[in-house]
From Swiss-Prot:
One of its GO terms (molecular function) is cysteine-type endopeptidase inhibitor activity. It comes from the Eukaryota. Bradykinin is released from kininogen by kallikrein. N-glycosylated. Contains O-acetylated sialic acids as terminal elements on biantennary and triantennary N-glycans. Glycans are attached at residues 36, 150, 182. Inhibits papain and ficin (cysteine proteinases) but not trypsin (a serine proteinase). This is Kininogen. The keyword Transcription does not apply. The keyword Glycoprotein applies. Keywords: Cleavage on pair of basic residues, Glycoprotein, Protease inhibitor, Thiol protease inhibitor, Vasoactive, Vasodilator. GO terms for biological process: vasodilation.
């Protein structure tokens, strides 16, 4: 019944998000610590919010993370049927939380196919056109979402307005006009 630190879980209970006065759904949930309670109660700490309004029925595939500048530190106690959350003050983390223990995954993994395609399609909305991608190399040990996956993609070389992205890519010696880019895809 007690959730161990380092385990990722969802808190998509509509009653929780409707109680939130932050106006955004909470998305990525990382167990920073846990406490003993009754037989079916545990305590968790949340780290990130999405841009989806609280109380909306928007699917997670259409939500994006808010920037790291404003994030909240939440705690909840949950039983089998109810979720209660208390909002604390805004915190500004020094770095993003770890998403779990990495392990090698099959390039044709069904668990990664849909969330990765959603992430790639969101990236495709950028001025840069992604033409091919290599299979992901690593993913967290947990097979349920949220996931983090490292992938290498080929992309056409970018224009000046995407120079920051271009700095993370290396020109492809064998294919003129293309670049190899290492990317980490986080999906909640």
């Amino acid at each position: 019944x007690l959730v161990q630190p380092g385990v990722l879980i969802f808190c998509d209970d509509p009653s929780y998000n409707s109680m939130s006065d932050s106006t955004h759904l909470f998305t990525l949930h990382f167990v920073x610590y846990s406490e003993n309670g009754s037989d079916s109660v545990y305590s968790l700490q949340f780290t990130s919010r999405s841009d989806c309004p609280a109380g909306s029925n928007k699917p997670w595939t259409e939500c994006d993370y808010l920037s790291y500048e404003r994030r909240f530190n939440e705690r909840l106690s949950t039983g089998h049927k109810q979720v209660y959350c208390l909002l604390d003050d805004v915190i500004i983390p020094e770095k993003a939380p770890c998403l779990g223990c990495p392990m090698e995954v099959d390039e044709n993994s069904e668990d990664l196919k849909f969330p990765l395609s959603v992430s790639i399609s969101k990236a495709g909305a950028l001025p840069t056109m992604f033409t091919r991608r290599r299979p992901p190399g690593w993913s967290p040990l947990r097979r349920k979402k949220p996931i983090s996956c490292n992938a290498t993609v080929y992309m056409t070389e970018t224009e000046a307005d995407t120079k920051d992205l271009n700095d993370l890519c290396v020109p492809d010696d064998q294919n003129a006009g293309y670049a190899n880019c290492n990317s980490t895809v986080n999906v909640a």
